[in-house]
Curated annotation (Swiss-Prot):
Protein name according to UniProt: Pyridoxal kinase PdxY
SUPFAM superfamilies for this protein: Ribokinase-like
Its job: Pyridoxal kinase involved in the salvage pathway of pyridoxal 5'-phosphate (PLP). Catalyzes the phosphorylation of pyridoxal to PLP.
Assembly information from the UniProt record: Homodimer.
Keyword Ribosomal protein recorded: no
Length: 283
């Protein structure tokens, strides 16, 4: 299947398209990346070279793909960190044009804004644009618990309230919601959870918590869930496969004490998930 991935790019390390493209290829997809920034490395280092790519240039790349007849062959559009606020208009326009060419195409949006520990780390213009313009045209969204609360205005602190927030997100437009980095009162201190939901139900998976955050893990998670989901539209199966691969990736990176995700070293766990974590239906 063909996936158009509109995200940031770094030359050194793995975030954005530099984290999403190879895992998607390893699970069998053709990936057409369009970059929204071109940096030497991710901004977590505090210093970097490069620049945001102007929205007009991003649009020109997408227009060129349309001229090649690519739109009707795109099965999914994936977007992540958007760089400048005007990129939202480009993405929304591209989604509409691609769906006109191929009504079966799905749009997966990773609404990158921040997290519970760091708060919001994007421009103040980005969150309302995601909430009001981008998320409503998405079929799949992959927020963390913090981002879900912002998008919906519904506190998500336990199972019931998180499901209510997911329902509120679905009312905004997306049919399928993956919530990452979930913490509930009953979640053990040494565990972390994800919840996936669509019109067929909601499922939870719990994995060991490794207190080791590396930039790009959310990008890999969004990419793998999207890549697995679009094959069979099976949220539980996509959740199980994604959780397995991402845990093995984080564990491998942690064991090596690597500053960057060890995606190449983890490629077998990505291509062939061990499915070591049970998925529980909760709704």
């Amino acid at each position: 299947m063909n996936i158009l991935s509109i995200q940031s790019h770094v030359s050194y390390g793995h975030v954005g398209n530099s984290a999403a493209v190879f895992p998607l290829q390893r699970i069998g997809h053709e990936v057409w990346p369009v970059h929204t920034v071109n940096f030497s490395n991710h901004t977590g280092y505090g210093q970097w070279g490069g620049e945001l790519i102007p929205a007009a240039q991003v649009r020109n790349v997408i227009d060129g793909m349309e001229q090649r007849g690519a739109f009707e062959r795109i099965d999914a559009i994936l977007s992540g960190y958007q760089g400048g606020s005007d990129i939202a208009d480009v993405i929304v326009d591209a989604v509409a044009r691609i769906k006109e060419a191929n009504p079966q195409a799905v749009y997966a949006c990773d609404p990158v804004m921040g997290n519970a520990k760091s708060g919001c780390f994007v421009s103040d213009l980005i969150p309302p644009l995601l909430r009001d313009k981008v998320v409503p045209v998405a079929d799949i969204i992959t927020p963390n618990q913090f981002e879900l609360e912002y998008l919906t205005g519904v506190p998500a602190h336990d199972t019931t309230s998180t499901l209510e927030a997911i329902a509120a997100a679905q009312e905004m437009g997306p049919n399928t919601v993956l919530v990452t980095s979930v913490r509930r009162p009953e979640t053990p201190a040494d565990a972390i959870e994800m919840i996936a939901a669509n019109e067929q139900g909601a499922w939870l998976v719990r994995t060991p918590f490794i207190d080791f955050k590396r930039n790009g893990s959310g990008d890999v998670t969004a990419a793998l869930f999207t890549g697995h989901y679009i094959r069979e539209r099976d949220a539980a199966d996509a959740l199980a496969r994604t959780a397995s691969s991402v845990f093995d990736l984080i564990e491998t990176t942690f064991t090596a004490d690597s500053r960057e995700l060890l995606i190449i070293e983890s490629q077998e766990a990505i291509a062939h998930p061990r499915l070591q974590f049970e998925v529980e239906q909760i709704a």
